[in-house]
Amino acid sequence: MNGAIITDNERINIEPKDVMVKGSNKKQGVNAQTSTQRRPEHQGMAKVIINPGTPDFNRFLTARNGAVIRGFDDVSIAISSLFKTVDAVKHPDLVQAIQDWFNELHEENNKMKENLVAYIKSIEFDKNDSFMSSTQFVPFSFEPVQLNFNNHNTMRFYKYIFEMNQLMNTMYEYNSLGLLAVSDYPVMSHNIIKSINLYVENVKKTLNVSRRKDGPYSPAEFITKVMQYKSVQAYIAAEMSGKRR
């Protein structure tokens, strides 16, 4: 598929406003919601509602009794704890070193999204064709998934998930209409889900989330290592290169 991937701007017009970020509108101590998704620890956090658009993405998000969502939560907590622990006033260079690494992760995801958008734009069909103009695609309807966050880096990751879900939906529709090569949709669906899993794996391993003992996550070891090596990348190269992809 030439490494490319997804979009018809009329069908998928992704703008920042498309990310349905909602802040809590209830007063402190007032239980204004009875939803089981609303837990006390979500107070003071933003949330985004993702409506899975394809069976593949729905299976991914709901697999293993919610293990994927729990992994997202682990990453969100670790990122939030990390940036709350590091004093940006006393250690601006350390904060920047950590952010530089996150920027690299986000850039990798952005490249995949851009390739997908370019691929979708390249898909052409005759809008004057009477058969094509008579066809309609009936979208799937799955239970929505709520993701909670309170850090810029987690927001960027969840925005990527939100947008890739939309792009996969467009790919599925085009595939249903017979507009894609036979292997394009399954290959790209696999690659998108893999990219999301890879981000989670990289963050959990590098921030030592996967190796934490029972109890709340502490970023102390990671911070010590970054201060020692002066960058996250140098720390990974020196001590973790054999443990990663």
Where are the predicted features?
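Polar/charged low-complexity regulatory segments
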Residues: M1-Y160, Q166, E173, H190-R245
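Short hydrophobic alpha-helical segments that form membrane-spanning helices or hydrophobic packing faces
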Residues: D184-S189
